Amino acid sequence: MRRFYSLLLMVLCCTGLFAKTKKAVYIIIDGVPADQIERLHTPAIFDIASRGAYGRAYTGGEIGGYSQTATISAIGYTNLLTSTWFNKHNVGGNSDLKPNYNYWTIFRIAKEQPKEYKTAIYSSWTDNRTVLIGEGKKETNNLKIDYVKDGYDLDTVRFPKKEKDLHIFDIDEQISKDAAEGIRK
């Protein structure tokens, strides 16, 4: 099994970076090896990282160990969002998703704090919010995400299918624009 590295960028307390309010930004980039991001030294990511932190996250688990996990999107996202492996969070693929909501996501942890925190998600896939995070489900205490931009994979009018799935680039561009606008507010 090929080792897969997912890029995880965490920025904590970015005072004055894009907005007047301190913000934590957690970015998951699927399918782009961290060494490529580092080799290209992408300006936007490293500008943010210079004022916060940058780190790699390995989402495949230990090969041959109890934590070994397939490197499929939903599994990896849930590994990162819950800080647990598949054997606990129960997301074993990209379909027939049945998360174990006893393992809280970073969104639920933020919302359950005594201090009020605003949350946002910018994603191509609605299931990241409605299923993996469990927005509105009784099992997640009816978790509510404050700012939502997702579901672009279902919008075939704005993002018609292109050869070699190049419409995904258009969707990613829109998500990036939405996120940048939201962070600046």
Model regions: which residues?
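Boundary/entry segment of secreted carbohydrate-active catalytic domains
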Residues: 23-28, 36
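Short charge-dense sequence patches
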Residues: 28, 52-63, 166-176
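Active-site nucleophile/metal-coordination loop of metallo-enzymes that catalyze phosphate/sulfate
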Residues: 20, 34-115
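His/Asp/Glu-rich, glycine-adjacent segments
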Residues: 82-185
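Bacterial Sec-dependent N-terminal signal peptides
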Residues: 1-22
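Active-site-proximal beta-strand/loop segments in catalytic clefts of secreted hydrolases
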Residues: 27-32, 59-61, 84, 122-127
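Hydrophobic alpha-helical membrane-insertion segments
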Residues: 11, 39-40, 132
